[in-house]
């Protein structure tokens, strides 16, 4: 699947020359640059979500543009989050495993268990 392939690619790029790959360049610049990108993309997702929500409220609105922007920005956020996880020697499988652990558990119960 795409997530598995992307995870493998991100691992390969960790050791690549920084002038050959955007991901390798991010890894070389380090965690602060990677986190800066995660923060930037988070903000862009928030703005795109707000724009999409506003567009949906307009009578007879065509929201295709705003929806596409939201999906695109979310993909950017996921991508940079995966780069962050890779840089920290983790990956999407760890997140999927955690989501699986939480599945079927009340959100309130799960939150209380973390305290």
Question: Can you say where each PLM-predicted feature lies in the sequence?
Answer:
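Flexible "arm" and connector segments at domain edges
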Residues: 1-74, 78-115
């Amino acid at each position: 699947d795409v997530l598995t392939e992307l995870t493998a690619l991100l691992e390969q790029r960790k050791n690549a020359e920084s002038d050959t790959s955007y991901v390798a360049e991010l890894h070389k610049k380090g965690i602060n640059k990677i986190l800066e990108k995660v923060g930037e993309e988070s903000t862009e997702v928030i703005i795109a979500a707000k724009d999409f929500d506003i567009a949906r409220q307009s009578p007879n609105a065509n929201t295709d543009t705003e929806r596409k922007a939201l999906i695109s920005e979310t993909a950017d956020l996921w991508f940079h989050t995966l780069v962050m996880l890779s840089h920290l020697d983790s990956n999407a499988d760890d997140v999927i495993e955690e989501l699986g652990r939480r599945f079927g558990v009340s959100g309130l119960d799960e939150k209380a268990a973390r305290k």
